[in-house]
């Protein structure tokens, strides 16, 4: 396991870098070892962060009652069946649309349509929607995904994800980093033994590496 005190040191060091005229994000980076990426190694996880500064954007693909409830719950966007079919007629607009949102939730009844019209674009981006049953509490799903980040590595021995921004307390950023680490570690063939290095950096800052190795 990685030491929380070491993660705290790295975050503190990263935040001490030069200030910019905008709020910089904090990125948590993991580098792996002893994994054969040719054997299909991939990570695509959704991690709910204990603390957040700005919510992730969530689009709901639903019609009828679920669509209404999603709108009432202030989903960033709600697209019904007709809207999906329309998106499917323009791939360029579909790509632009998909890039606007971090996560997608979809009524299970619409999943066949989603796969047909947007699957070829959503799939490679690791953004295939999470299915939601018609009678499920879409409000709870929205709350969870707004405080989540996507952690993804595909044919690569490293990954990077946002854990917050420089305005957040160090302790909150540490909690977020540990949540990401814990989720990824469980997906590695040999757990922490497959972690070569962890690093932290701000948007425009230098990379801060850990001291020693993860054991």
Curated annotation (Swiss-Prot):
Gene label: rpl1
Keywords: Repressor, Ribonucleoprotein, Ribosomal protein, RNA-binding, rRNA-binding, Translation regulation, tRNA-binding
Name of the featured protein: Large ribosomal subunit protein uL1
An example Gene Ontology CC term for this record: large ribosomal subunit
Single GO MF annotation: rRNA binding
Pfam families attached to this UniProt entry: Ribosomal_L1
The organism's taxonomic lineage, starting at the top: Archaea, Nitrososphaerota, Candidatus Cenarchaeales, Candidatus Cenarchaeaceae, Candidatus Cenarchaeum
Chain coiled-coil ranges: none
Function: Binds directly to 23S rRNA. Probably involved in E site tRNA release.
SUPFAM superfamilies cross-referenced by the UniProt entry: Ribosomal protein L1
């Amino acid at each position: 396991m990685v030491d929380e005190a070491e993660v705290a040191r790295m975050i503190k060091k990263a935040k001490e870098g030069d200030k910019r005229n905008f709020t910089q994000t904090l990125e948590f980076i993991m580098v792996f070892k002893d994994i054969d990426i040719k054997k299909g190694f991939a990570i695509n996880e959704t991690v709910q962060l204990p603390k957040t500064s700005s919510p992730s954007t969530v689009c709901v693909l639903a019609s009828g009652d679920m669509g209404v409830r999603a709108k009432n719950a202030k989903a960033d966007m709600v697209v019904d069946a007709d809207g999906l079919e329309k998106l499917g007629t323009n791939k360029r607009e579909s790509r632009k649309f998909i890039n606007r949102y971090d996560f997608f939730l979809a009524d299970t009844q619409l999943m066949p349509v989603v796969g047909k019209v947007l699957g070829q674009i959503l799939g490679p981006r690791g953004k295939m929607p999470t299915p939601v049953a018609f009678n499920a509490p879409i409000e709870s799903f929205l709350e969870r995904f707004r405080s989540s980040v996507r952690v993804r590595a595909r044919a690569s021995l490293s990954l990077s994800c946002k854990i917050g921004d420089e305005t957040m307390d160090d302790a909150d950023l540490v909690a977020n980093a540990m949540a990401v680490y814990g989720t990824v570690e469980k997906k590695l063939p040999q757990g922490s033994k497959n972690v070569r290095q962890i690093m932290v950096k701000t948007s425009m800052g230098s990379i801060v590496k850990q001291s020693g190795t993860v054991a």
